[in-house]
């Protein structure tokens, strides 16, 4: 039997199946966004939960859930974040469909992700990465730039970012140039 770890913050998740899987392994309260149907009332509720308990945004590694994450960050920049790697969110059975989701993640993958909670970076003056650094490292130009960004997002557990958003995402989480270089040391095509 798994010893359920207590999580004091409220986790914002996409739906009922995500909540079910999280509660299977953790003592946690969740707020479900009902897929991508987040509205102003949801944002107000999440803001209230954040004031009372703290909030961790833990959404699926797909486009719609990144949209939800951005909507929440815009209004509540101090929320915490957890990211699953895409391969950790893939259904283990072919009968479960092809969607990515927290509902498919194992206990070990969820525990690893939750152990790496991140917050928005607060001191922009210390951010040391430039657009030219990203070009030089092959994140914005080149045949494998998308794969490089995917790999980096997984290694740093900050989620995928397209070329236009990568610099902003790295700054958001206070990632240093040294951390980027370290994360990419094991990258191979």
UniProtKB/Swiss-Prot annotation:
GO biological process per UniProt: rRNA processing
Protein residues bound to Mg(2+) 1: 14, 60
First-tier enzyme category under EC: hydrolase
Source superkingdom: Bacteria
Domain Toprim: 8-91
Cofactor annotation remark: Binds two Mg(2+) per subunit.
Cofactor(s) listed in the protein's UniProt record: Mg(2+)
InterPro entries: RNase_M5 (IPR004466), RNase_M5_C (IPR025156), TOPRIM_dom (IPR006171), TOPRIM_RNase_M5-like (IPR034141)
Catalysis performed (reactions): Endonucleolytic cleavage of RNA, removing 21 and 42 nucleotides, respectively, from the 5'- and 3'-termini of a 5S-rRNA precursor
Subcellular location per the Swiss-Prot or TrEMBL entry: Cytoplasm
Entry keyword set: Cytoplasm, Endonuclease, Hydrolase, Magnesium, Metal-binding, Nuclease, Ribosome biogenesis, RNA-binding, rRNA processing, rRNA-binding
PROSITE patterns: TOPRIM (PS50880)
Main location: cytoplasm
GO molecular function, one term: rRNA binding
An example Gene Ontology CC term for this record: cytoplasm
Known EC number: 3.1.26.8
Residues annotated as binding Mg(2+) 2: 60, 62
Family membership: Belongs to the ribonuclease M5 family.
Function: Required for correct processing of both the 5' and 3' ends of 5S rRNA precursor. Cleaves both sides of a double-stranded region yielding mature 5S rRNA in one step.
NCBIfam families per the UniProt record, alphabetical: 5S_RNA_mat_M5
Protein's recorded name: Ribonuclease M5 2
Encoding gene per record: rnmV2
């Amino acid at each position: 039997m798994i010893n359920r770890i207590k999580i004091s913050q409220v986790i914002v998740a996409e739906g009922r199946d995500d909540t079910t899987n999280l509660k299977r392994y953790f003592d946690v309260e969740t707020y479900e966004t009902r897929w991508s149907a987040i509205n102003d009332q949801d944002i107000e509720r999440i803001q209230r939960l954040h004031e009372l308990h703290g909030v961790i945004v833990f959404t699926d590694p797909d486009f719609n859930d990144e949209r939800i994450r951005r909507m929440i960050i815009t209004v509540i920049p101090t929320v915490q974040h957890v990211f699953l790697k895409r391969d950790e969110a893939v259904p283990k059975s072919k009968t479960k469909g092809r969607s990515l989701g927290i509902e498919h993640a194992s206990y070990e993958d969820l525990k690893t992700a939750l152990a790496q909670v991140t917050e928005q970076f607060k001191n922009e003056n210390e951010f040391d990465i430039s657009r030219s650094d990203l070009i030089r490292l092959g994140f914005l130009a080149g045949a494998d730039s998308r794969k490089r960004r995917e790999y980096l997002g997984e290694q740093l557990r900050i989620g995928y970012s397209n070329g236009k958003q990568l610099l902003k995402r790295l700054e958001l989480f206070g990632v240093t140039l040294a951390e980027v270089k370290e994360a990419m040391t094991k990258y191979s095509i």
